[in-house]
Structure formats: C-alpha cells, structure tokens
Amino acid sequence: MADITIAGVMRAGAYSPNHIGNDTAIFNLVAEQLRKRGCQVNVYSEEQFNKQEIEEPVVLAMCRERASIAKLQKLEDEGKLVINSGYGIENCTRERMTRILLGNGIPYPESLIVNTNENIKSQLKKAGFKSCWIKRGDFHAMHKEDVSYVRHPEEAQEVLQEYFYRGITRAVINVHLVGDLVKFYGVKDSQFFYWFYPFDEGHSKYGWEEVNGHSQGIDIDLKELKDICTRAAE
C-alpha cells in the first residue's frame, strides 16, 4: 500500500448528531492505520473538500452534505476510487432507500411516502397505521425533529405539517414495530459483521431507542440477518 495518496474527507458536525466524538475517532483511527501501512492521507474538512481541487487518486469519505455527495459522484465518474461511493450514500437517504429496499424484497416496515403538505389521516387509517415513525425523506437526518414517533393519525398529521413549515417537502412514514431494536455494522464480502442492542449500550442519536426500551432477548437468526444485510448492500 506504500506510495498510495488518499484524500480523507471528514464529516461536518451537523451530520454527527450526538456522535461527533465517535465519528472523529473512527476517521482518525482509519487514517492512522493507513499511514502505518505506508499511505499518505491528506485530511480535508467538508468545506475544504468542496472548495478545492482533489488530485488524490483515492478518496476516503465520511461526508454527508449535498454538495459533498455530488462531488464524490463526479470524482467517481472521473475514475477515482471513492470509499464510500457517493451513489451509495445518496441511496441511503430515506425515501430513496425505502423505495430500493421495498422494490427488491428486502424485509422493511410497511411504509408510506408522502408530500408534507398532504392530508394523510385517511391514508394512515386505510393502511392500518396507528403508532408510526415519520422521517424526513429528502436527505439524511440532522436534528431530532427529523425523526418523529407518533401514536395516532391525528398526531401524525400535526407532525407532518411541522415538517412542511421547516421546508422539508417529502417524508417517509414507517409503521412502528414492537420488539427488540438491533443495530448492526457490516462490510460486504468480508467477515466483519457486528450487532448490538443500542438502548442497552446507551448508544443513541436522538434518544428514540427508549420507545422500544430494554431488549427482551428475542432469538435472532444471525445468519439470516447477515444474509438480509448482504442483499440490501447489493
């Protein structure tokens, strides 16, 4: 790996809610390990990345701003190796991800995709939704208010209207599923796959894990979980 020059792009703090320290530590540790292997890692903030010409042949990115993602895609189209792909990051925005997963038969909560200026009460009642989650659909969540738990259609309508007033035009509504909440990290085509109960570990972005509460230890078929995650990554 010697003589490889890498542009390392950090994540703006606005996209690391309650995890700025964690995300910075991950980035720094990865850069440190690459340097130990002989790579030169040039570090850019998102602002620097968007303003400067990137000459490095490899880009290691944790960025999330719209302009950053567009630039990652441009660099990838020009032939640079970009990790993670700007196209993959864009596919993880809520509405796009929901359409991709449902369209490919990946297990996913029943969902509605709506404009935030719609009257949704009748849609929710027809779909049988009571408790559900409203999430901004246009981009990555930046604030606690970008993800909302509601207990009935009337409350959902009020929250959706608040999204509209904040300039968010699209939202995804997921039915609430009762059960253990699991978080996982994995790398496709590798042995790395790690899962845990975020509420039990005190790992949280917005505190919404408390809705499901402490885990009950429901049996998990880890092979099936990993297989589902692999299919989703594809």
Each model region followed by its residue ranges:
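Conserved N-proximal alpha/beta basic substrate-recognition cap immediately N-terminal to
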Residues: 10-115, 119
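Short polybasic/polar patches that bind polyanions
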Residues: 35, 102, 125, 230, ...
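Active-site nucleotide/adenylate-binding loops and adjacent lid/helix of ATP-dependent enzymes
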Residues: 2, 7-12, 77-79, 87-174, ...
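Short N-terminal or domain-adjacent regulatory/targeting segments
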Residues: 1-2, 43
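Phosphate-binding site of ATP-dependent enzymes
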Residues: 149-232
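C-terminal active-site "lid" helix and adjoining low-complexity regulatory extension at the edge
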Residues: 30-33, 219, 234
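Short catalytic/ligand-binding loop motif for oxyanion handling, primarily in non-cytosolic enzymes
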Residues: 68-69, 141-143, 181-183, 194
